[in-house]
Design a protein with these regions (language model features):
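N-terminal signal peptide c-region/cleavage motif recognized by signal peptidases
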Residues: 15-18
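Surface-exposed, polar/charged faces of alpha-helical domains
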Residues: 24-27, 38, 42-45, 49, ...
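Low-complexity, intrinsically disordered terminal/linker segments enriched in charged
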Residues: 158-197
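Surface-exposed, charged secondary-structure patches
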Residues: 101-141, 193-197
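Bacterial N-terminal signal peptides that target proteins for export
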Residues: 1-8
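Short beta-strand edge/turn micro-motifs at domain boundaries
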Residues: 140-142, 146-168
């Protein structure tokens, strides 16, 4: 009997963390995406004169939605340790700016497509993939958000659009630079791309 209780306790201990996570990552990501959609649909932010205000609102949401440090670490992978602490900090800032510059205009081109969140898949104890689909007249676009649990909050560290991972895409680009050049060369490249050279 005692052995049975021990086994049941262990099973409950293994099951509870997964059960406790159910629903929360999806709801968290959906909440952020809904806020983005609210900004994009706001009539007061439609005029060209409100473009900066719209971008500022979107940036504020992305800062809560994404873990840009984790995203940066995963993008550089083993090359992350080649950067000094100061270089790591600057890289995160520059990479964040690059992503904002690259994707904000694409997001602002939104034309009232419907976004449906379908399910979440547990990847590890602290990482989950939240799956969604953008419904357009021309077809469906699958978008998966990979999130990690940090400080009791689910934050996005990668986005997979139609099977293409944002992290893997940039990792291959940065790997080519770091394969034969020092970290400072990568940082200088990013400075030029975001206009901070």
């Amino acid at each position: 009997m005692k052995r049975y209780l021990v086994i049941m306790t262990l099973l409950v201990g293994l099951i509870l963390p997964v059960s406790a996570l159910a629903g929360v990552p999806l709801e968290t990501v959906k909440g952020h995406v809904d806020k983005v959609l609210d900004v994009l649909r706001d009539p007061s932010l439609k005029p060209e004169s409100a473009k900066k205000a719209k971008k500022d609102r979107l940036r504020a949401i992305s800062e809560k939605m994404f873990d840009f440090t984790e995203l940066s670490k995963r993008t550089l992978a083993h090359n992350w340790t080649k950067l000094s602490p100061e270089q790591q900090k600057e890289f995160v800032g520059l990479f964040t700016s690059l992503l904002e510059n690259t994707y904000t205009n694409k997001i602002m081109a939104y034309t009232d497509e419907k976004i449906v969140f379908t399910k979440e898949i547990l990847l590890t104890e602290k990482t989950v993939e939240v799956q969604s689909t953008v419904l357009r007249k021309s077809g469906e676009i699958p978008i998966f958000y990979r999130v990690t649990l940090k400080d009791d909050s689910w934050r996005v560290y990668d986005v997979v659009i139609e099977g293409v991972s944002l992290v893997n895409n940039y990792r291959s680009q940065f790997k080519d630079i770091l394969s034969n050049k020092p970290p400072e060369s990568l940082i200088e490249t990013l400075r030029k791309k975001v206009g901070k050279a």
